[in-house]
């Protein structure tokens, strides 16, 4: 009795506590115990009274003496000055604090620490009990009374829960909040049956074999109420979410694949039965009573073998229909069959899982896609790319003759879009970093190994060809190498653009400008090397050809020999030699 009183008191305190949730990640960030004393009157006034827009308070005023831990840490980190309050889970902006010059709210109160109402969701007290059920006492069913055991077996707790959900749905018509509240009640239980059919079957002699096993102490000691599992759990633990991201433009439905030997109670559910699969579709209008009726179906079956936990493989499919609402999402659920102790499978009742409420109108696939790691996303991307190539190849072979006109047009549009995307991706690897156009006569610069097209290099080396810096790394270009294979690939894949650049290059004067080249050490008096420089072989990017080249590292020995300077010197020496010869001839032929 003492524990039951404590449990009642604890549940009563939970019912009186309301919470605030982040508008983005839907995580609990604060409770009503952190608000100021007048906040309850403020909430009632905002809901019921028709006050002017200037007098309505748009923030939640927080009590400085009862702040949440994460807010206290942020305030202490800012040394009780000024700062912003961001969500500790997703980082979204929620409010702020100001202890330097405390601003005054429109309601007349000082907003030292406040949370914005537009960035938080206030959850009323009706849904407070759905947030975190008590596990301390419910995990030990052997201390419960007989009434509790009867309610446990007959599903009385499920009816009370449905009654609470119905009240919440009537008070709050937001389908997103109701769906979230329902998600918190998903538990992997071992056995839960409807009261009427269980009691009726218990009286029949052929069910006396397995009905007493449910009320024995051995089965009652098994953990019935487990910790609530939300949809925010890790995927590898309970839910295996495999979104099929292929775009399907035809009208499709989702099928819940069940075994052929499993009879299903479909009374009151809007399902369309087929041979061994059942399709369900979300209606356009939200009906809380229908949702609760679907949720009230007993979700589990009797199990006697070890390890027969009920598991759901939830495969989220991003399927959009052309004739239905775009918010209607479909899910594919695998319900694996558990072990049975009776030879007649039709004698045991099996029902749909309560997860079928997940195809609510406001459930998005963004959180599912974020769960996928980089490896899975790359695999999906590769599969889609291979499928598109296969479809293009089949289309070229003319094997789409049996496809309808509309499907063929849709397929052509899809493949044209995919081809454009792949064309853009392939073109990025053949674009020069200077002119941002495809390569025309590409050259690789040494020693930085950056590749540029010929017009760009000649333009850069116009003023100073002997000390031209690389436009990317600013390294002095000592020599350039022509890339034959890259040039041929560019000419093959981008013929029109290549020819256009070629015509413009031939018409311009840049073809007469020199390519960049650095001075080379010419050993006149430093002595020639007996051994040749080591010959190296490098694999250039973009699939360029291999090239054997000498070691052109800078060498301090010997004199620097510049070809341009040599030409200048030769011309100047010729004039000097000619002048000397002229003077010598004048001396002999015209003596004084």
Curated annotation (Swiss-Prot):
Q: Which GO terms describe its biological process?
A: adult behavior; norepinephrine metabolic process; positive regulation of proteasomal ubiquitin-dependent protein catabolic process; positive regulation of protein ubiquitination; protein polyubiquitination; serotonin metabolic process
Q: Per the record, what about its domains?
A: The RING-type zinc finger domain mediates polyubiquitination of the interacting protein.
**Pfam families, per this entry?**
RNF180_C (PF19332), zf-C3HC4 (PF00097)
- Region described as Interaction with ZIC2: 281-489
Q: In which pathway does it act?
A: Protein modification; protein ubiquitination
Give the originating organism: Homo sapiens
- Positions of the zinc fingers (RING-type)? 432-474
Give the keywords, sorted: Endoplasmic reticulum, Membrane, Metal-binding, Nucleus, Phosphoprotein, Transferase, Transmembrane, Transmembrane helix, Ubl conjugation pathway, Zinc, Zinc-finger
Which residue ranges traverse the bilayer?
565-585
Protein's UniProt name: E3 ubiquitin-protein ligase RNF180
What are the subcellular locations of this protein? Endoplasmic reticulum membrane; Nucleus envelope
**Complex formation:** Interacts with ZIC2.
Q: Which residues lie on this side of the membrane: Extracellular?
A: 586-592
Q: Name one GO molecular function term.
A: ubiquitin conjugating enzyme binding
Endoplasmic reticulum as a keyword of this entry, yes or no, is yes
Gene3D superfamilies recorded for this chain? Zinc/RING finger domain, C3HC4 (zinc finger)
Q: Fetch the PROSITE patterns from UniProt.
A: ZF_RING_1 (PS00518), ZF_RING_2 (PS50089)
Q: Where on the chain is Phosphoserine found, per UniProt?
A: 230
Reaction(s) catalysed by this chain, per the record, are:
S-ubiquitinyl-[E2 ubiquitin-conjugating enzyme]-L-cysteine + [acceptor protein]-L-lysine = [E2 ubiquitin-conjugating enzyme]-L-cysteine + N(6)-ubiquitinyl-[acceptor protein]-L-lysine
């Amino acid at each position: 009795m003492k524990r039951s009183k404590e449990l009642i008191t604890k549940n009563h305190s939970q019912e009186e506590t309301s919470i605030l949730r982040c508008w983005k990640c839907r995580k609990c960030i604060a409770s009503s115990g952190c608000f100021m004393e007048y906040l309850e009157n403020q909430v009632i006034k905002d809901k019921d009274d028709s006050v002017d827009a200037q007098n309505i308070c748009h923030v939640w005023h927080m009590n400085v003496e009862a702040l949440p831990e994460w807010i206290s840490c942020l305030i202490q980190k800012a040394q009780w000055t000024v700062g912003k309050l961001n969500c500790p889970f997703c980082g979204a902006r929620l409010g702020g604090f100001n202890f330097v010059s405390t601003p005054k709210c429109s309601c007349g109160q000082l907003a030292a620490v406040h949370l914005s109402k537009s960035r938080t969701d206030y959850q009323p007290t009706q849904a407070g009990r759905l947030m975190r059920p008590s596990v301390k006492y419910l995990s030990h069913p052997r201390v419960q009374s007989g009434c509790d055991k009867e309610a446990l077996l007959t599903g009385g707790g499920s009816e009370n829960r449905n009654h609470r959900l119905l009240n919440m749905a009537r008070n709050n018509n937001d389908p997103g909040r109701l769906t979230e509240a329902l998600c918190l009640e998903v538990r992997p239980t071992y056995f839960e049956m409807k009261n009427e059919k269980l009691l009726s079957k218990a009286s029949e002699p052929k069910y006396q074999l397995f009905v007493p096993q449910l009320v024995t102490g051995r089965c009652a000691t098994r953990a019935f109420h487990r910790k609530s599992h939300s949809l925010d759990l890790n995927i590898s633990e309970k839910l295996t979410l495999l979104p099929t991201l292929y775009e399907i433009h035809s009208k499709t439905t989702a099928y819940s694949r069940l075994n052929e030997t499993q009879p299903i109670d479909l009374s009151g559910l809007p399902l369309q039965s087929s041979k061994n699969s059942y399709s369900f579709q979300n209606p356009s209008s939200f009906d809380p009573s229908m949702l609760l009726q679907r949720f009230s179906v007993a979700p589990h079956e009797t199990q006697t073998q070890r390890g027969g936990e009920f598991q759901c493989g939830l495969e989220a499919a991003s399927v959009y229909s052309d004739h239905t609402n775009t918010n209607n999402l479909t899910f594919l659920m695998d319900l694996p069959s558990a072990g049975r102790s009776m030879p007649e499978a039709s004698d045991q009742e099996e029902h749909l899982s309560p997860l079928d409420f997940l195809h609510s109108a406001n459930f998005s696939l963004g959180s599912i896609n974020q769960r996928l790691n980089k490896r899975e996303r790359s695999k999906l991307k590769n599969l889609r790319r291979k499928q598109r190539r296969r479809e293009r190849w089949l289309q070229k072979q003319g094997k789409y003759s049996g496809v309808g006109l509309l499907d063929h047009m849709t397929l052509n549009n899809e493949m044209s879009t995919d081809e454009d995307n792949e064309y853009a991706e392939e073109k990025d690897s053949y674009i020069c970093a200077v002119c941002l156009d495809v390569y025309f006569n590409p050259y690789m610069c040494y020693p930085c190994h950056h590749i540029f097209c010929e017009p760009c290099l000649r333009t850069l080396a116009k003023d100073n060809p002997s000390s031209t810096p690389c436009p990317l790394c600013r390294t002095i270009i000592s020599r350039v190498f022509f890339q034959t294979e890259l040039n041929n690939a560019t000419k093959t894949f981008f013929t029109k653009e290549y020819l256009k650049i070629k015509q413009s290059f031939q018409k311009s004067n840049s073809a007469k400008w020199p390519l960049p080249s650095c001075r080379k050490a010419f050993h006149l008096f430093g002595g020639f090397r007996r051994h040749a420089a080591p010959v190296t072989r490098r694999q250039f990017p973009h699939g360029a050809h291999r090239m054997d080249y000498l070691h052109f590292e800078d060498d301090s020995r010997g004199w620097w020999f510049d070809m341009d300077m040599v030409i200048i010197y030769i011309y100047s020496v010729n004039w000097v030699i000619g002048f000397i010869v002229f003077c010598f001839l004048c001396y002999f032929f015209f003596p004084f």
